[in-house]
């Protein structure tokens, strides 16, 4: 079997970033594969999240903070200068795209086709052709045409999703995986520096999954046997990364 990676955010900012990243990956998958009407679920979820909260200010602050830190790292010896330069240039470009006055995805509200679909998609079984004949018509179009439409809709969120992907890459890069053991299925850790993300990599052959809880300075991991749906009493070896 293969190793599975589980991530637990330890603050609300990273929690939001991970949700947006999850939707972004679904959007990319829908651009590469024809999933018929299912492609609209992540798109509408992203619309709803962006309407609830304007993430731009938080992301712009995070970009500035990381650019400052990267500039300091540039002055250090034995540093991967090419990698640092890549992130500085990518974040600078992302900052410029995100500084537009209009909220990401706001223009999609004016799209009558999407608005009609979105009103119905929350209802069970509401994608029948008698409920949404316009969807039935759109799905009959060639995949290349539908893909172009979908790319145009997704592009409205790229100024937000691109920097979030970069910021999460930087967050994950702050810690390498290290071997750890959960005795009797339990592991507890602490840190003197503020943590933002706990990552657990465990072999699926163990037949269990971790439930992770905690805050910026302390966290706990309980392993649960999937078949029995109860806490494991076995010692579980896994890989752990605690990201600042």
Swiss-Prot record:
Organism ancestry: Bacteria, Pseudomonadati, Pseudomonadota, Gammaproteobacteria, Alteromonadales
Annotated keywords: Cell cycle, Cell division, Cytoplasm, Septation
NCBIfam families, sorted: PRK05287.1-2 (NF003654), PRK05287.1-3 (NF003655)
UniProt cross-references to HAMAP family, sorted A to Z: ZapD (MF_01092)
Pfam family, one: ZapD
Annotated GO biological process: division septum assembly; FtsZ-dependent cytokinesis
Family statement drawn from the similarity comment of this UniProt entry: Belongs to the ZapD family.
SUPFAM superfamilies: YacF-like (SSF160950)
InterPro entries according to UniProt: ZapD, ZapD_C, ZapD_sf
Compartment list: Cytoplasm
GO cellular component: cell division site; cytoplasm
Record's protein name: Cell division protein ZapD
Subunit note: Interacts with FtsZ.
Function per UniProt: Cell division factor that enhances FtsZ-ring assembly. Directly interacts with FtsZ and promotes bundling of FtsZ protofilaments, with a reduction in FtsZ GTPase activity.
